[in-house]
Amino acid sequence: MNTNESALLIEIENYILEIYNRKSKPKDFYDDLSRLLIEFNGIYNSDYSYFGCIEAFVELLRELNICLGCQGELAQQLKNLSFKYIQCRFEFYVSRHKRKLRDHRYSENENTAQLVKRMRTVSQRYSRILVVRLDLAYKKKYHHSVDIADFDNDMRILRQRIHNQDGIFKGLIEYAWALEQGTEKGYHCHLLLVYKGHEHKNAYGIAERVSEIWKKITFNQGCYFNCHSPEYLNQFEEQGTLGIGMIHRNDPDQVGNMLKAIQYLVRPEKEEQYLRVKVCKRMRTFG
């Protein structure tokens, strides 16, 4: 695959939202539309589930008898459809998009509440817990070769390792993960791991070992961010808001900061980070 699937889907979504809000036809409307349609056709998979606005392009591919081999020819054929007609088509899918975003926000709120409940229970059960946070993604130079199927497969392997408590995951008492898609990071995962504090003490070291597993799973295409690097932690320590690392049950401030920090995994405000495509409708994005 030579197309950056993640970036293209975000570009298409932004394009549809822009056209929906336009008062008049943009100068290069048909050229831009034909280019995006051809590029989308190159990555389109009928088995996948596309989010909101992207469905407008799926329907254009299905319904219009158009030539997708040449951008110039396609642009000419698209001119048979008025700007207002296409804009009205987009309007229908933008409305569906907004409804799905509301559903997404509700689901994320539910996930947040469940995670906070789980972590509050864990913090009450043990005198101290080690909360480990890291983000897993792909190096930018490989974004063009990683699609949603690759991301889903890599995450399935990682989750199986976690579930089996294999290696560094031995002794886990809680964990959570959230799959997202961003303009800069592409497909990525926020990962939370929780251990008994009397058995593990080095959160930075654990995150580093997990990152090595991620690199192996992705054949060295993966990258990571260790949330326990001193530079990153210092800003929270200075503000008195540090909520990862060693958390003591008898320190209400630490527990409170921890419960706030873990909400970042599924924070509803990060709406632009949702997946625009899933390998199937039931593909999980949080657990």
What does each of the following model-derived ranges do?
Residues 1-85:
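Extended repeat-based interaction scaffolds and adjacent low-complexity, acidic/S/T/P-biased segments
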Residues 35-41, 48-74, 94-125, 197-287:
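Catalytic "initiation/cleavage/transfer" segments centered on a nucleophilic residue
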Residues 116-176:
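Signature for HUH/AEP ssDNA processing cores
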Residues 135-137, 180, 268:
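Structured loops at beta-to-helix junctions and adjacent beta-edge loops in soluble globular domains
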Residues 139-143, 194-199:
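A short, flexible beta-alpha/helix-coil linker loop
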Residues 148-149, 192, 205-208:
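"Short basic amphipathic alpha-helical interaction patches in structured regions
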Residues 174-198:
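Histidine-centered divalent-metal-coordination microenvironment in nucleic-acid enzymes
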